[in-house]
Amino acid sequence: MRKSIIALTPLMIAPLCWAQEKPNVVIFLVDDMGYSDIGCYGGEIMTPNLDKLASTGVRFTQFYNTSRSCPARASLMTGLYQHQAGIGQMSEDPGTFKKETQRDINDWGSEGYQGYLNRNCVTIAEVLKENGYHTYMAGKWHLGMHGQEKWPLQRGFERFYGILAGAASYLRPEGGRGLTLDNEHLPAPESPYYTTDAFTDHALQFVGEQKDDKPFFLYLAFNAPHWPLQAKEEDIQKFTKLYRSKGWDKIRQERYNRMQKMGIIDKNVGFAEWENRSWDELTEKEKDESAYRMAVYAAQVHCVDYNVGKVIDYLKKTKQLDNTLILFLADNGACAEPYLELGGGKQEDINNPACNNMPSYGRAWAQTSNTPFRKYKCRSYEGGISTPLIFSWNKKLGNRHGNLCTIPGYLPDIMPTVLEATGAAYPETYHGGNKIHPLVGTSLFPAITEKVPSLHEYMYWEHQGNRAIRYGNWKAIRDEAGTEWELYDIVKDRTEKNNLASQHPDVLKKLRNEWEYWAIKYNVLPKHQDSPMLFADTTRTGRPFSKDPHVIPFHGKYLMYYSVPPKGNSGWGIGIAESTDLTQWKPIGSLSPAADYEAKGLCAPGALVRNDTIHLFYQTYGNDKKDAICHAWSVDGVNFTRNATNPIFAPKAGDWNCGRAIDAEVIFAKGKYFLYYATRTPDYVKQIVGVATA
């Protein structure tokens, strides 16, 4: 690596010695991994290379991401809030570009919601390339794919090998979720193939082919352990007996004990409320299948560790390890999708090369992965936004090897940290003169050197209606499923069990006002609706965003229930919005799949108010002739209890219908309930309307 004299910018607040000799920079990013999965954060998964990296580095115990894949990548790559970079919601994926509109469904016509990195931000790669670095990437991009101008080589990287989409098969990535080398799509790889290994091998190839002594930046963004569950059999066998014999209750307790012993969590931290059955309540078959799913997930994490070790070994052999800044972190908390206790997808599809979106390991194991925190990916509770962060730089850490850093930080801090380490200058303009947003993050070095008590006065989050703000010990949050803001003393209560909103209304009001000011300033609240009579639910991805509305008056206001389809054809849900004038609506909650019969989704709601209770009737989705009508009720219009006998209705198949029931509408008249529904003739050709009474 060449030595250079650098000029300090106002951004560089640490001594000049940090960047006198430019270091290499390596960022490892993993996908959907929980806070407590790896060994050095309390996990039982064997991760010896990461554990060793942590022993020679610093572990952050309160580092935060944005709770979702592509928004997290946007923030990490740019040092901005994801909305500033154009990815407030989701990024482009296969099938999201609509020819009829010549527009991606993730492009809402608002600066904060374009679905790809905009031109008012720069990536770490773009900045470092301008400052004398080689720039390489391997792995998952997920920051724009419809048009080469959005690909890695057009955003600062010299070489790229990986996937542009948000998910792909580990064993045979192909089609729109296939592999890309530089600017060329590749055919499906020959078996045996595994993405984690291939990404690392290509990354090391890029670095090894370098002809000069310039420093390099390597961004190695694994798609592991994101679904689908696919791993090498020899790795799976290392974990199957462990999870079958102990189950999630014991695993969770053992993780918790190790985390406290390590100092990862404070002694006063308990467990978040458990949302699932105990392990002993499962059937033997359920235990077998669920333990195997967790074993595959653990094998995916274990393989990541092995490949991190390959990179470290290369740096050692080439005598570059001491002056290489290494960061390891996750894009969000563990993933519970599709929010079923035991996971989504069929058991026989595990390790099926043709699968690229399911199966998954389920809500119970996801909550275990996030021990001891509340919730998971997409939510702004600690389980959704907390990530391990290992910071290693042998040459500069001095006697801080193995330390824990308890000062909170978050993704916008990565870019300023890299700039301070490398001495690179952050531009005011780029992309042909475009004005670049100023950085919102700050360098992590003052936290590592313990020169400051904190890095941020406020920290902010928003994704799909999940909102949060942290101010000192206080954290205010409004969850996608709730109607009110909650308030927690996050130092005393990091598992967010004791809502203090009613005890400290002034604190909550201050934080809400601050969050709303931030949301307006940074394009979090989209301004793209052309008329107050238009409504688009921005809390979920959709195709379209809202349909099948049903409006009822309730408690002096109006409630609207509507279908909210995601990308793809499974996981439909029901959105809830409220209004006082029938034109201005705001989302206040949702119903997501919560049982096996709803695994592929629920939609087409109809509502009825009786005795101050809302009765919601809706259909299951994606089961063809087996789709049926379900029932739930609520006293507040938002929090619903499912009928224990769901599905409650499907017509008996006969000479006039096929046995299917969808699109429910219920009225009460003449002392009876009349259920109107759509069905089909036995040949499944003609759609007709049926009626049933109760």
Question: Model-found features: residue ranges?
Answer:
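Beta-rich carbohydrate-recognition and catalytic domains
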Residues: 36-38, 98, 529-663, 667-694
